[in-house]
């Protein structure tokens, strides 16, 4: 029994060399196999390469020779363009109208030949082959080879047939799209008329809902020089209304009280009669235009009133919010920028102004004199660009009819007294760390 145990340990060491030997022997066998496999693979690869080259030459020769044989009289320019057609369908469409123009010369020859160049219909290549055979038998014999795969592609001929129709359609469409730009141009000329009248309504006509952003863009362009220059740019259009508004406060109320009706009579005074129908399209929207020249003074008259008034018109509770309006207005301005709901303001404007339209004239009279309050837009201007804020203020103020300062209750008198802050006292007495655990 003690004898058998010693022999097992010696066999243990030999196995690693046996593994090494096996590893060395296996690659020898695999090398022989690899040599045989390599020879077969090389032969196969050589054969495939030769076949690929021959196929490429066979396929390319007839495609290039067809246009050459058919368009020999037409010139090499057609041959150079037709391969582009094969690469790009747009080129084929461009070539087909040329074929249609020259179709009077050869109806069966050229258009059918151009189509096969663009991977076109299978039925037509035989026609091209028929036209090519009298020219060159070699071309026809070579052409039959590519035509067979093309015939095997029925979907492509179907596509090519609609392409022929689409080519004609594209012809009409190519001729048609230019007319729409003139149509747009035709639509554009009426806009320049309103552009002369007021640059904002032009966008209003094009886009009913987004007019307000459009108006904001225009005042931004008009307003960037400064709020006072904002008045002069509309003034060329509203030269009569601007000075009249400054000299006579009553005109603003007509704009504000009945937004729809007075604009009709006021518009002929501002501009020529033929543009009246265009104005009826944007009666409510043109009110902001003239009001812009007049609206900035009321804000200037009382910036706090504007700040307090902007929240009230939606809520219709100005006196309640008049006490501490200044913080909310910036939020409302941002909200108006994010989502300017022009239609509701117009509805609100149309429904509310009769009640609010009467009081505004006194503020317009009072503010016409003092223009110092433009600093509030400057405050926002530090946050944002001054020009955009000014233009936005002009547009936003023009939408709403604000209550005069007289309507709001007088603010409480300010009494100076020392205010005790518990946080500071606690920090001084106990220190900051013990307080949070007590609060928690």
Curated annotation (Swiss-Prot):
WH2 domain sequence ranges: 36-53
Taxonomy, superkingdom: Eukaryota
Tissue: Expressed mainly in brain, colon, lung and stomach (at protein level). Ubiquitously expressed, with high expression in brain, kidney, lung, and placenta.
Pro residues composition bias: residue spans: 1-18, 176-193, 222-236, 249-262, 356-378
Biased composition (Low complexity): 116-133
Disulfide bonds: none
KW NAD (keyword) present: no
Function: Plays an active role in the formation of cell surface protrusions downstream of activated PDGFB receptors. Plays an important role in actin-microspike formation through cooperation with WASL. May cooperate with WASP and WASL to induce mobilization and reorganization of the actin filament system.
Protein name: WAS/WASL-interacting protein family member 2
Organism: Homo sapiens
